[in-house]
Every structure is written in C-alpha cells, then in structure tokens.
C-alpha cells in the first residue's frame, strides 16, 4: 500500500526544505524524498539578501541561522586592469527591516529548515531516488528507488525541487527552455585570509580571464571563491588547475587550504510551465540562472514559498486550482524579466573582453561607488524577485517593503546599474 501525503517534495536542498516547512505550517502533510544519504554540503550559492531574510524570519528560523552564519554589510568590486577597487556599504533604511545579507551554507539552511519541519510532522526520507511518477485524476503516485528496493508514495501533489537536472521535470515531460553557457564555473571553499589583500566580505572581480566571485562564508575564515574556466578543458583535471587560478587571486600566496570544490555548467533556463497536472516545480528545477549576483537562490526560494502559500490554499479549498497556472506564469515572468537579465548583465561585466566596454563598466562602478544611495540600491534590487504573490490574503502580501521607501527601484535593470 502506497504511503499517502498531501504533497511530496523531491529534493532536500534549501528550496525543498523551506518549501516543506512553509507547507507544513499551513497544515499540509508533507513527505520529502532525497536521493542522497544526507543533506549535501557542496559549494553553491550562500548569500541570502534582505528580501530572503523576510522568509527566514516568517518561517521562524532567522535567529538560528544568524547564529550560524555571517552578517555582511560590505561589497567590493575590483577591476585589476585599472588598479581600481570600490567598496559599497549597506546602511539602515527606514521601512526596510534588514540592513545586511546573511552568508550561510546551503546545507545549514536546509538542515535548520528540516529540523523545524520534522517537528511539524514532515517526513524526510534519504536514499530515496525518484525514478517514476504516474499522474492520475486524483493525484500522483511516485516510485522511489531505495536501499531496500522500490517504494511507492501517493500524494495530491508533487513538487520537483531537485535541481537544474530535475528528474521530476523530465518525468513530467516539461521542457527546460533557454540556453547553456559555453563556460564552466568552478566553486571552491577555501581557508584563506582574503581580507589582508584588500577584499571585502563579498566581492566581484572583473577580469576577462580571471573573473571571480569571492565571499566570506562563516565566522571561522571559510571563503567561497568561484571562477570561470573554458569548458573545453578536461573536467577530470579541474582540481589541478585550481592552484593556478589561486596564484592570481591570492597574489602568489600559498597559505591556503582547499576544503571542497565543485565544477558546474551555467544555464539561463526555465520550465515551459511550472505546473502540469499534479506536478509543480520550484528552485533550480523551475528556473536556473548563472550565479553572478546571487539571484538564483533568491528567486528559487521565493518560487518555493509562494508555491507553498497558493498550494496550501488549494489544499484547504480556499483557492481554485487555476491559481497554480497563475503561479507558473508569474514566477516565469519574474525569472525572464528580472532574474535572468540581471544575472546575465553581471556575468557580462565580470568577464567583459572588449576594452571600450570595460572602460564603460569602470565608469558605471565608479558612479555606483560615488552614489550615496548605492548601498541601498544594491540591497533593494533583490526585492524585485518577490513579484506578485497572487492572493490578497497571502502570507507574503506585505513582504515587499520597497513601496514605502524614498528610493525607486522600478527602473533598475540590475544590481550595479
């Protein structure tokens, strides 16, 4: 006999677990299936903007994560070709509840969310790999491969939060439209004192060869250094090349310890729909962007919690299922109109090869640095990712505070300009 839930979520990453917690808080019975033996600690996006801190506080886990992670209020942009570095500092803004961004590992966020979700009855099953689904008139049956053989689970709804290579999306026959970039990114976690070299707690390094995103991850001196390399280089030897790249970023210092590393391809893609029959998508399974600027995690989490709100309302009989199509349309709009263009512009600026354009980028960065509102604009842009929360009595109806501040972010196309 298949086990019955209101919702099955595939994927126990931060989006999957935050979505599970949000659904459980609405009273839904939730089962999470994760193919790995435990929550994975891999180098991935680790910055939570003020627009996401709203979610963490509403779900009741922000204080716990603040105690684990690192609160950052500075952002550095470095253009070595011109010997230029700028620092933008975020300051308190009246009407905005947070003046910092939280740096925390995805594994910590997922773990804390899981612990809170389990207290509400969410079942989290590791070593459960989704291998088949059967969408029926009254719900969906999911087959998972386990160490003890295949098991089946039944639910009204299935959410794929299982990453850019989503099995759920593939099994549901949902196309992942867009393109994949020719470059490969390598994300590394490293113990090294970047501050002594003039880096800030979060940094863009703009260079046509040695672009990088460098950020402090915790209070113990662990940093994320993510850089780009040609995808034609052999994947199996990427670790050997890390030291060559570090030579440039660390200016010849050998005083570092590599903790972990992970290569991955970059995408600008979204599901052609995020709702098909009884299957829904969230996180990178719904839409995947290059990581420049941290908007992928931000938008993925917002897609998950908006989905939890509308789906919870459907389960309770407060909303018609048609709201799920509106959810799909709105989250795809936010991705293609806000997230993807901004992340694409960030990536372009970081790796720009044209000398004339690099001069223009330098001027834009200088202007940002000289603008007294620069820190505010940098911080506020990510609120555009919230979009329409679709219900007048949504849990998130008051999440966007930007209409109440004196700065207008409507015309901004990205975080820098």
List the model feature ranges, each with a label:
Residues 115, 157, 161-266:
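Conserved FAD-binding catalytic core of PHBH/FMO-like flavoproteins
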Residues 3-5, 148-157:
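Core beta-strand elements of the Rossmann-like FAD/NAD(P) dinucleotide-binding domain
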Residues 3-32:
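N-terminal Rossmann-like FAD-binding beta1-loop-alpha1 element of flavoenzymes
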Residues 44, 48-118, 216, 339:
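Active-site-adjacent segment of FAD-dependent monooxygenases/related oxidoreductases
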Residues 11-21, 113, 160, 258, ...:
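Conserved mid-domain beta->alpha element of the FAD-binding
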